[in-house]
């Protein structure tokens, strides 16, 4: 971390004694620069190319290779239009640094840490380099603890680990964005924490939609930006591969400051982790490296590891990361998702079938998994309840074909009871969200883990068999379901 004396200008160290080179070759987003003997920049140093007087050129590059003969190869973080051989290159003497701290909340940044939301400059007195080592072993918090989200289906069936990494699998229109926003909202209210969203290879439209929805739901406070609970960092699809490869590190650097200096629990979203690998593959090819399996970069595991190992819990705070994972051609053995899976502690799978039924969040209770769901970690009561919920849901799934062909009446008494309870469980796994209040008209609910376990135990025990299944739909805790059942009964009597 660096404390800069002034708030002006981009994140570049003082250039009184400029180390100057010149461009000798440009191949798309990659350029070679020649420096004087003995003045070679280090790997990962930021280089700046400025145009002559009157030219609107200001391109930042990152040194990737030392070629010998005083030449370096660098990857540009923005378009290289207008660059020519012979142009002057300034070695900043340090890696790319970005603004960190409270000034970043409520704002949108690019990979260089420059605001792109037309809301004026950002305080850059405190900056931090995007390249740094992972926390040392002695700094790590090895205690296994659950990260309570207040979302019933997540906390019960696939609990998140504090400082863990979660893979979020879901297609378009199944509620991924709303789930992300609810998690941001809940961590702000329940844990007093902040969130950082890294859009890696994000569609510009999706990024814009997310920003607008965050403003509408109050996650970003337009009237008082400082009270916002999220910082956004975007490297869109149209950006050069260098920007898409490094934007994840920019977001992570901002999150690390909140963890290490402010000692907060931070939520880090990366959408999409596959595009981080894809950008690395493009850069690797441009640098002339021999490709590895399926055309990926030979450094795939190293690049993924250097990003993922920085996402962890320390004694000061934690970074819990939720990463959207795209699986190419649904092939889980593809090197990109396979390398990602090795780092994940939990998977949250969103189901289009549940979304079609109107059950939100549309988290699939059978496909979602977590390494935390062990009796030694969550306790016997939680573990047993979760297993019974899964067994009941699994049995219902097996019986659906029979029900479709022969109907419910052909089932045994025991199976009919299982189906009735499974349908109540399915509906009770739904929940009204705070960020969706504007659309649903129902006030959002945060449900504690103890309340969640109690609710499902009551359904499984058969104590609530007499209640109609619609009483369990879109409620918070089980007491609300009981109250809703009484209201439905009163309404039915009035109708008669």
Curated annotation (Swiss-Prot):
Domain of life: Eukaryota
SMART domains per record: AAA
PANTHER family in UniProt: ATP SYNTHASE, ATP SYNTHASE SUBUNIT BETA, MITOCHONDRIAL
Top EC class, one word: translocase
HAMAP family per the UniProt record, alphabetical: ATP_synth_beta_bact
UniProtKB keywords: ATP synthesis, ATP-binding, CF(1), Chloroplast, Hydrogen ion transport, Ion transport, Membrane, Nucleotide-binding, Plastid, Thylakoid, Translocase, Transport
Record bears the keyword Protein biosynthesis: no
GO molecular function annotations of the record: ATP binding; ATP hydrolysis activity; proton-transporting ATP synthase activity, rotational mechanism
Leader sequence segment: none
Listed name of the protein: ATP synthase subunit beta, chloroplastic
Gene Ontology BP term (one): proton motive force-driven mitochondrial ATP synthesis
SUPFAM superfamilies (alphabetical): C-terminal domain of alpha and beta subunits of F1 ATP synthase (SSF47917), N-terminal domain of alpha and beta subunits of F1 ATP synthase (SSF50615), P-loop containing nucleoside triphosphate hydrolases (SSF52540)
UniProt-listed Enzyme Commission number(s): 7.1.2.2
Function text: Produces ATP from ADP in the presence of a proton gradient across the membrane. The catalytic sites are hosted primarily by the beta subunits.
Pfam family, one: ATP-synt_ab_N
UniProt subunit comment: F-type ATPases have 2 components, CF(1) - the catalytic core - and CF(0) - the membrane proton channel. CF(1) has five subunits: alpha(3), beta(3), gamma(1), delta(1), epsilon(1). CF(0) has four main subunits: a(1), b(1), b'(1) and c(9-12).
Similarity comment text for this entry: Belongs to the ATPase alpha/beta chains family.
InterPro entries given in the database record: AAA+_ATPase, ATP-synt_VA_C, ATP_synth_F1_bsu, ATPase_a/bsu_AS, ATPase_alpha/beta_chains, ATPase_F1/V1/A1_a/bsu_N, ATPase_F1/V1/A1_a/bsu_N_sf, ATPase_F1/V1/A1_a/bsu_nucl-bd
Catalytic activity as recorded in UniProt: ATP + H2O + 4 H(+)(in) = ADP + phosphate + 5 H(+)(out)
Annotated ATP binding sites: 170-177
Membrane topology field: Peripheral membrane protein
GO cellular component, one term: mitochondrion
Record's keyword annotation contains Chloroplast: yes
């Amino acid at each position: 971390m660096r404390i800069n004396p002034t708030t002006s200008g981009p994140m570049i160290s003082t250039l009184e004694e400029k180390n100057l080179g010149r461009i000798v070759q440009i191949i798309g987003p990659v350029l070679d620069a020649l420096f004087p003997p003995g003045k070679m920049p280090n790997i990962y140093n930021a280089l700046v190319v400025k145009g002559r007087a009157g030219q609107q050129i200001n391109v930042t590059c990152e040194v990737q290779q030392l070629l010998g003969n005083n030449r370096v190869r660098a990857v540009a973080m923005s378009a290289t239009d207008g660059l020519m051989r012979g142009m002057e290159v300034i070695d900043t003497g340090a890696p790319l640094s970005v603004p960190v701290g409270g000034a970043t909340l409520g704002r949108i940044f690019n990979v260089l840490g420059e605001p792109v939301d037309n809301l004026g400059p950002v305080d850059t007195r405190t900056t931090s380099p995007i390249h740094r080592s992972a926390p040392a072993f002695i700094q790590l918090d090895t205690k296994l603890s659950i990260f309570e989200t207040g979302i019933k289906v997540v906390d019960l069936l696939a609990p998140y680990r504090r400082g863990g990494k979660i893979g979020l699998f879901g297609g378009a229109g199944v509620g991924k964005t709303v789930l992300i926003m609810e998690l941001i909202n809940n961590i702000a209210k329940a844990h007093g924490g902040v969130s950082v969203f890294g859009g890696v290879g994000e569609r510009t439209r999706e990024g814009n939609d997310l920003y607008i929805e965050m403003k509408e739901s109050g996650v970003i406070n337009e009237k008082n930006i400082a009270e916002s609970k999220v910082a956004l960092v975007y490297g869109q699809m149209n950006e050069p591969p260098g920007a898409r490869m490094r934007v994840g590190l920019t977001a992570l650097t901002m999150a690390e400051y909140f963890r290490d200096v402010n000692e907060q629990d931070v939520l880090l979203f990366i959408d999409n982790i596959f595009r981080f690998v894809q950008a690395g593959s493009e850069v690797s090819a441009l640098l002339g490296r021999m490709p590895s399996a399926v055309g990926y970069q030979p450094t795939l595991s190293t690049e993924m590891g250097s990003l993922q190992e920085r996402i962890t819990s320390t004694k000061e705070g934690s970074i819990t990361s939720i990463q959207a994972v795209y699986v190419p051609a649904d092939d889980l053995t593809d090197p990109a998702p396979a390398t990602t899976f090795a780092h994940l502690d939990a998977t949250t799978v969103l189901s289009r079938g549940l979304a079609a039924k109107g059950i939100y969040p549309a988290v699939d209770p059978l496909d979602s998994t977590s390494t935390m769901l062990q009796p030694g970690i969550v306790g016997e009561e939680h573990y047993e309840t979760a297993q019974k919920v899964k067994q009941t849901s699994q049995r219902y799934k097996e019986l659906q074909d029979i029900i479709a062909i022969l109907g419910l009446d052909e089932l045994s008494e025991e199976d009919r009871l299982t189906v009735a309870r499974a349908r109540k469980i399915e509906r009770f796994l739904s929940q009204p969200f705070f960020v969706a209040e504007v659309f649903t008209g129902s006030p959002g609910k945060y449900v504690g883990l103890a309340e969640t376990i109690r609710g499902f135990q009551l359904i499984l025990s058969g104590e609530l068999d007499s209640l109609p299944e619609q009483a369990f739909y879109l409620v918070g805790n089980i007491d609300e379901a009981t109250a809703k059942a009484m209201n439905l009964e009163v309404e039915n009597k009035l109708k008669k």
